């Protein structure tokens, strides 16, 4: 059996789009009862995906806006990004576009492993962003797209499978061996 791989994933988006709900559904299989703004939480989960075992570290960030400064801890050592907007909020999609540009600029990259996620698909009667709009943006960014309902746990696992797929697409060759330390003589 192949050794376990570590993946560090950062979940980003504006306030109240459901980042914590998606993360908690995936990690703990439950939805928070009430909304409490997140400062920052880190979660761990061991999963098996496509025959490989992964230790997934998930950073659930505080809600951002277009004026937020991208914190260094959200760019250093991160393998992939889950960029979440609410299908009920046009402004949350605009924030995601700005965040995407900030991440690319911070990393000096044209493309990064990421998944665009339209959350709150259960609120279809309040929808302001069509599924096609999400797909179109994901196609422009050349990344995966998933619509989900964190509240109802619909497609939540798919979000995390897709980010692992995106990270693995960007991986070249085997991971470097773990350093064991050195001895100076």
UniProtKB/Swiss-Prot annotation:
InterPro entries: P-loop_NTPase (IPR027417), Small_GTP-bd (IPR005225), Small_GTPase (IPR001806), Small_GTPase_Ras-type (IPR020849). It comes from Dictyostelium discoideum. GO terms for cellular component: autophagosome; cytoplasmic vesicle; plasma membrane. Pfam families: Ras. One of its GO terms (molecular function) is metal ion binding. Keywords: Cell membrane, GTP-binding, Hydrolase, Lipoprotein, Magnesium, Membrane, Metal-binding, Methylation, Nucleotide-binding, Prenylation. Its EC number is 3.6.5.-. It is found in: Cell membrane. It is a lipid-anchor. Residues 183-185 form a propeptide. Gene3D superfamilies: P-loop containing nucleotide triphosphate hydrolases. One of its GO terms (biological process) is positive regulation of TOR signaling. This is GTP-binding protein Rheb homolog. The modification Cysteine methyl ester is found at residue 182. A motif (Effector region) lies at residues 35-43. Mg(2+) binds at residues 20, 38. It comes from the Eukaryota. The gene is rheb.
